[in-house]
């Protein structure tokens, strides 16, 4: 299965998604804030992030997620990025929108997320 980096500032959602992905056979690394993502990129086959992370005032801010997307790509990481957000319109029309492989609106059914992972990652390495 896939090595997945999962990043979300909501610890409850982070743990829940991690358990569901691990139960499906995936290896999951967790990042509870945007600054914790970069060290895991080299070993991740897919990156799944929330869009809104706390800004310097502690308020949820899509600008933090957009900055994270740029940092992921500037690091040289070519892994598919899946954005899961309650506000996908925050990404719409931005340059960062072209840097991600999939945008999914919360709440996301685990079956939909697993399907996206299979399509973006596992499908690329499946025997023909």
Question: Which ranges hold each PLM region?
Answer:
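As written
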Residues: 95-104
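Conserved phosphotransfer microenvironments
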Residues: 50-70
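Acidic, metal-coordinating helix/loop segments flanking the phosphotransfer/catalytic sites
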Residues: 29-51, 55-56
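Conserved acidic carboxylate
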Residues: 8
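Hydrophobic/aromatic residues positioned on beta-strands within the core alpha/beta folds
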Residues: 84-85
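Conserved phosphotransfer cores of two-component systems
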Residues: 41-42, 71-78
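C-terminal output helix
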Residues: 108-117, 125
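Two-component/phosphorelay signaling modules centered on CheY-like receiver
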Residues: 11-29
């Amino acid at each position: 299965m896939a090595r997945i980096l999962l990043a979300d500032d909501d610890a409850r959602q982070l743990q829940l998604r991690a358990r569901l992905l691990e139960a499906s056979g995936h290896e999951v690394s967790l990042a509870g804030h945007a600054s914790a993502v970069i060290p895991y990129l080299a070993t991740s086959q897919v990156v799944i992030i929330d869009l809104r992370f706390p800004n310097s005032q502690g308020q949820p801010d899509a600008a933090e997620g957009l900055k994270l997307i740029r940092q992921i790509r500037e690091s040289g990481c070519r892994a598919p990025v899946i954005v899961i957000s309650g506000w996908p319109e925050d990404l719409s029309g931005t340059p960062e929108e072209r840097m991600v492989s999939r945008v999914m609106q919360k709440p996301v059914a685990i079956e939909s997320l697993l399907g996206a992972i299979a399509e973006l990652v596992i499908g690329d390495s499946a025997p023909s």
